[in-house]
C-alpha cells in the first residue's frame, strides 16, 4: 500500500511521523513524507523518501515568530492575529505541494500542525485520513489551562477554541477547498473529520491524563509516544563523561528559542554548583560559540534521549511531548520550564502525576531553579517517577501499534 505522511513543524514534530513511516516501510509499504525543506535531510538520513512541504525553513520561522512576539506586551487580539499570520500565509502553498504527492495514496497521515490542510486534500482525493495527536486536542474534561478547571468548562473552552480557529482560517480554507473542487466548509475541521470517520491516534500514554481514555471510550486509540530512538555522534562522549562522576541533571529546550545560551549556561552552572550537581546541557539550535566553561558542566548540541536520560538524576526541559515522554520512560523526575503551545499542559500533567514540577521559562531564576531541583530530587519524586516508568508503553510497542492501526484503516477503505 501507499502511505503519504504530511508533517509540518520542527524536529520534534517530524520524528514521530518518521518513526511510523519507517515501520510501515519495513512492512513493505510505499512511504513518502512531506516535511519542511530544512528537515528533508533528517528524514532521508533515516532511510525514508521525502519531499518539500512548504518553502520556508521551519526553525527559522519559529525563531522569527519568537523574536517578533514572545517578549512584547501587546493587545491580545493583535497578538492573536499576528500569531495566525504565518498559518494563513502558508496554507495555499502547502495544499498545492501536498495535493499531487497524495494522489493515489491508500491513506494520508497528518501530524498535528495544519491538519485542516491535509484533511481537505484527503477529501479531495477520496482517501482515508489519519491524524497523530501529541496531546489531547479534541474536546475533553481532563487537561489543565494550566490551572485545573471543572470538566464541562474545559470541554466548552476547547470547543470554543476550535470554532475561533476555524473562523480565523475560514478565508484561506474556503479558498483551498474551492481550488480542490470542494464546497465551503460549514463546520470546524474536527467535526468534519469525525463525520468522515478519520482515525485520530493519541501518540502519548493514556496514564498521562487520568480519566481521558474512559471519557473518550475507545474512539481515539492511545499508542504512547513515537520515537526513532536514534543515536547521535555525541552519545559515546557523553556516556564517558557521565560514567566518570556522579549522574548529572539534563537540561535541554528542544527547538525553542531561549535567548542568550551563555546566560542560561551561567544560571544552570550556578544553580547546580550550589546543589553539588553536574549538568549536561543540550544547546539544540542555539549558537554555542563563546559560552562559559565549567568543570561540572558539559555542553553538547544534541544527544539520544533514550540512551542518556536513564543515566541522569533528573531532566529539565521545555515540555515538548516527545521529551516529556522520554523523561517519563527513563523513570527520573522532571522539571518543565515551558515556553508555548502544549508545553504548559504537560507541565500541569507532570505535577498531577507527582513526578515533577513546572513553571514558565521566562520566570526561571537561579533561585527558583535551585528550589525546584531540590523539590524534584526528593525521594518521593524519585520513587514515583520509577513507578510511572514501569507503566509507560515501550517505544517499539508504540510504533507497532500505530502501524497496525494505519494498515487496518487503509484496508477497510479499499
Swiss-Prot record:
Keywords: Glycosyltransferase, Transferase. GO terms for molecular function: hexosyltransferase activity; UDP-glycosyltransferase activity. It comes from the Bacteria. InterPro entries: EryCIII-like_C, Glycosyltransferase_28, GlycoTrans_28_N, UDP_glucos_trans. The keyword Manganese does not apply. One of its GO terms (biological process) is lipid glycosylation. Its EC number is 2.4.-.-. The keyword Amino-acid biosynthesis does not apply. Belongs to the glycosyltransferase 28 family. PANTHER family: STEROL 3-BETA-GLUCOSYLTRANSFERASE (PTHR48050), STEROL 3-BETA-GLUCOSYLTRANSFERASE UGT80A2 (PTHR48050:SF13). This is Uncharacterized glycosyltransferase MT1575. It comes from Mycobacterium tuberculosis (strain CDC 1551 / Oshkosh). The lineage of its organism: Bacteria, Bacillati, Actinomycetota, Actinomycetes, Mycobacteriales.
Amino acid at each position: 500500500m501507499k502511505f503519504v505522511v504530511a508533517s509540518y513543524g520542527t524536529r520534534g514534530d517530524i520524528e514521530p511521523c518518521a518513526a511510523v513511516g519507517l515501520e510501515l516501510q519495513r512492512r513493505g509499504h510505499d512511504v513518502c513524507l512531506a516535511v519542511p525543506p530544512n528537515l528533508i535531510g533528517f528524514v532521508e538520513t533515516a532511510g525514508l523518501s521525502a519531499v518539500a512541504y512548504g518553502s520556508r525553513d521551519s526553525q527559522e520561522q519559529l525563531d522569527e515568530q519568537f523574536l517578533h512576539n514572545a517578549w512584547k506586551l501587546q493587545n491580545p487580539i493583535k497578538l492573536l492575529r499576528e500569531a495566525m499570520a504565518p498559518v494563513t500565509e502558508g496554507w495555499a502553498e502547502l495544499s498545492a505541494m501536498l495535493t499531487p504527492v497524495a494522489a493515489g495514496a491508500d491513506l494520508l497521515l497528518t501530524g498535528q500542525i495544519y491538519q485542516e490542510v491535509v484533511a481537505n486534500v484527503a477529501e479531495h482525493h477520496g482517501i482515508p485520513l489519519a491524524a497523530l495527536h501529541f496531546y489531547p486536542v479534541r474536546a475533553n474534561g481532563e487537561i489543565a489551562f494550566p490551572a485545573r478547571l471543572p470538566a464541562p468548562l474545559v470541554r466548552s473552552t476547547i470547543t470554543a477554541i476550535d470554532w475561533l480557529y476555524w473562523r480565523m482560517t475560514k478565508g484561506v480554507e474556503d479558498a483551498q477547498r474551492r481550488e480542490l473542487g470542494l464546497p465551503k466548509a460549514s463546520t470546524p475541521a474536527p467535526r468534519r473529520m469525525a463525520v468522515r470517520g478519520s482515525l485520530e491516534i493519541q501518540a502519548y500514554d493514556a496514564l498521562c491524563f487520568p480519566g481521558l481514555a474512559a471519557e473518550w471510550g475507545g474512539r481515539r486509540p492511545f499508542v504512547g509516544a513515537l520515537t526513532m530512538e536514534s543515536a547521535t555522534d555525541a552519545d559515546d562522549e557523553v556516556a564517558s563523561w557521565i560514567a566518570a562522576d556522579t549522574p548529572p541533571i539534563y537540561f535541554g529546550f528542544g527547538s525553542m528559542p531561549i535567548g542568550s545560551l551563555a546566560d542560561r549556561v551561567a544560571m544552570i552552572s550556578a544553580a547546580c554548583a550550589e546543589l553539588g550537581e553536574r549538568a549536561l546541557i543540550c544547546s539544540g539550535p542555539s549558537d554555542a560559540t563563546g559560552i562559559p566553561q565549567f568543570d561540572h558542566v558539559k555542553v553538547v548540541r544534541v544527544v539520544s534521549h533514550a540512551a542518556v536520560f536513564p543515566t541522569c538524576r533528573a531532566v529539565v526541559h521545555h515540555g515538548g511531548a516527545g521529551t516529556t515522554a522520554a523523561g517519563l520512560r527513563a523513570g527520573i523526575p522532571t522539571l518543565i520550564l515551558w515556553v508555548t503551545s502544549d508545553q504548559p499542559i504537560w507541565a500541569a500533567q507532570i505535577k498531577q502525576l507527582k513526578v515533577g514540577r513546572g513553571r514558565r521559562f521566562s520566570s526561571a531564576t537561579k533561585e527558583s531553579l535551585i528550589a525546584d531541583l531540590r523539590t524534584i530530587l526528593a525521594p518521593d519524586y524519585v520513587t514515583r517517577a520509577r513507578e510511572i516508568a514501569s507503566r509507560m508503553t515501550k517505544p517499539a510497542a508504540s510504533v507497532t501499534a500505530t502501524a497496525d492501526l494505519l494498515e487496518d484503516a487503509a484496508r477497510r477503505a479499499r
